[in-house]
Amino acid sequence: MAKKVAIILTNEFEDIELTSPKEAIEEAGHETVVIGDQANSEVVGKHGTKVAVDVSIADAKPEDFDGLLIPGGFSPDHLRGDAEGRYGTFAKYFTKNDVPAFAICHGPQILIDTDDLNGRTLTAVLNVRKDLANAGAQVVDESVVVDKNIVTSRTPDDLDDFNREIVNQLND
């Protein structure tokens, strides 16, 4: 059965960390929905990729989705700057309810705002790892880490492994 995956995103995302997993999800027969600050707007990646925002964070309901993708780049840091903390609250639904959450590179920064990392094993790009550890996570240096429903990965070099695990989780 096809599943629906939310992608939370804003400007300065790492292009390939969005396009590659999104393509893998869609090629596996699942749907993706881009969520951002404003529906029917456009966000631009660090390398110029333009992506339409389908649904605003104000209108998005996490329970409508079967998974969450958080690409890296500077987007996660910008999303964490949301004054109302809506992106962390959105992500918390997934971590607390055992719904798959996929985060790569700087993406796990959003997971810090879920207050649900204590005792979880994660990976991320090097300069995010200390923040994850300070949030209570056990941090390892592996291409992909699966801890229950949370799947994390380090960098674009790990995309093949990350994409494979995303599809495995969605097809379970």
From Swiss-Prot:
The chain positions of domain PfpI endopeptidase read 3-171
> InterPro entries, alphabetically?
C56_PfpI-like, Class_I_gatase-like, DJ-1/PfpI
| Family per record | Belongs to the peptidase C56 family.
**Coiled-coil positions:** none
The protein in question is named Uncharacterized protein SSP0918
Q: Name one Pfam family in it.
A: DJ-1_PfpI
